[in-house]
């Protein structure tokens, strides 16, 4: 049964596990917000919005995006559902994909090392979410939230610069960043935070401090792996916590919406026009190392037909997201 405590030093390293990808890549989905079974508001795609996860050689069949939702707990220290070596994070995001029975592919259940009877109806991607204050800007006001919940981010157009013709927060294929220089970049960005080579996008170059950080050779502390040496099991899998600024703003506004905040019963919904991509809550592409196991849904009926893909690298959202989610009345 899921969730589980992942013991990293007992995990078996597999060099050939597939990369986590989506088809079509970077597709923006129109979603509406509904009340999840455990009263966690979830973002479900509108009819006609199709997006699939690709995990070749791990699962067969087509798995279609079903929803995004976020879990938190009674305390900040134990908010995530999964844990690694007994350590939790304040929240955990789940990207849920359901087998598309409209295709001609039957779902299979493939255990590492061989197949066994049964099948996976779901693929769920779990992401550990940390919270922070720095780098997320001012709280969005009501007018800004109205624009965001209609599918338009005020500082984001898909391929270019931010408001007023300057270089603001950029979209998926942006270049320059926050201060009109090279700041926070999109997935295919170049330079990073301080106008130099800082935080890069998926196809960027240098890491945190203009040296070899996230997408360079070395890990978090300028050396190899998580703790300045070689990472878990001796493999060089360094992580740097990505700040999910755009996602934070969307979640803040959605959870603050009057109707969403007053969700009490399962099945309640609010037709907010929110544009999301599955990339938003995920680490950059080159840092999507993951643990995978076969388990169950974490809410009733707790069906044991889920392939879990739990991201090793964490993502940070604004602390305001945590407070807003806790203020949803029925949660």
From Swiss-Prot:
Residues that bind substrate: 298-299
Cofactor dependence: Zn(2+)
Main location group: secreted
Statement: the UniProt record of this protein carries the keyword Transcription: no
Assembly and binders: Homooligomer; disulfide-linked. May also be disulfide-linked to insoluble organic matrix.
Segments of this protein annotated with the region 24 X 3 AA approximate tandem repeats of G-X-N: 162-233
EC number: 4.2.1.1
InterPro entries per the UniProt record, alphabetical: CA_dom (IPR001148), CA_dom_sf (IPR036398), Carbonic_anhydrase_a-class (IPR023561), Collagen (IPR008160)
Regions of compositional bias (Low complexity) in chain numbering: 157-232
Ranges occupied by Sequence repeats: 162-164, 165-167, 168-170, 171-173, 174-176, 177-179, 180-182, 183-185, 186-188, 189-191, 192-194, 195-197, 198-200, 201-203, 204-206, 207-209, 210-212, 213-215, 216-218, 219-221, 222-224, 225-227, 228-229, 231-233
Catalytic activity: hydrogencarbonate + H(+) = CO2 + H2O
Tissue: Expressed in the mantle.
Region (Disordered) residue spans: 138-240
Chain sites annotated for binding Zn(2+): 69, 71, 94
Basic and acidic residues composition bias: residue spans: 144-156
Entry function: Acts as a negative regulator for calcification in the shells of mollusks. May function both as a calcium concentrator and as a carbonic anhydrase required for production of carbonate ions, which are assembled to CaCO(3) at mineralization sites. Is important for shell formation in both the calcitic prismatic layer and the aragonitic nacreous layer. Shows inhibitory activity of crystal formation when present in free state but, when attached to the insoluble matrix, may regulate the form and size of aragonite crystal.
Name the UniProt record assigns to this protein: Nacrein-like protein P1
SUPFAM superfamilies: Carbonic anhydrase
Domain comment quoted from the record: The Gly-Xaa-Asn repeat domain binds calcium.
Domain Alpha-carbonic anhydrase: 1-331
A Gene Ontology molecular function term of the record: zinc ion binding
Subcellular location: Secreted, Extracellular space, Extracellular matrix
One cellular component (GO) term of this entry: cytoplasm
